[in-house]
Amino acid sequence: MLTRRDYLKLSALTGAASLLPSSLLAAFDADQLITRAIPKSGEDLPIVGLGSSATFRKVAQSEDVSALTDVIKTLLDNGGTVLDTAPSYGAAEEVSGEIGHDTGLTDRIFWATKVNAVPRGSGDPADPDKVNAQLERSFKVLRKEPLDLIQVHNLADLPTQMGAIRELKEEGRIRYIGTTSTNPRRYPELEQAMKDYPIDFIGVDYAVDNRTAAERILPLAEDLGIATLIYVPFGRSRLFSRTSGMDVPEWALEFGSTSWV
């Protein structure tokens, strides 16, 4: 469970604790799980989830994935549910699906995966057959239907790929759909997609040293009732690199923190 102390540790670098609404602070004090509602449905999700594009992906490509099993179990044991992955994350999607199946935890996970069958760097339209094949593979390796969320990765060929996942949602095979962009230069395209398509989620990068999404994307998402997945909230390792070798400030001891990590 994410408690007040845990969240303050996560927020120490961002100053976010001073901006929290009173309802959220009250939840911390009561040691309640901190959640946010998906605007389109009202379904609550814990505010902290698990990504799989970096360290998770590297370990997934190794022979011993027991550490990943422990990570997923720890997430679920503490009330988390969201696991974000993608076919392009090496073995991450397949291995996380195997772990969920082998441990009997598949149905406890909110699976968020992606689709992008556009040839890398080509700018060509996606082949509809390849789009459908990639989607069917995600159903197969994650072993859950309906899948909770599938997003078009990096705004790639939205007419083709958004069309495909919209059809699957209408068929009841996907619960939520969306799109992602981690490139601020493409945020105007993301804004337009948010207005043009009936999406439930977007995914963007946001960290204390990367707040571009807060200028237009996050306010627009709020206005349109679109849920947001935040990627790399610590800038991968940037924030920890900047504090390497620095003493933890005295005020951090007030919530039991003795390390920047």
Region spans (language model):
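Structural preference for beta-strand elements that scaffold enzyme active sites
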Residues: I47-G49, V82, R108-A112, P146-L149, ...
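A short, structured active-site edge motif that brings together acidic residues
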Residues: D107-G121, I150-H153
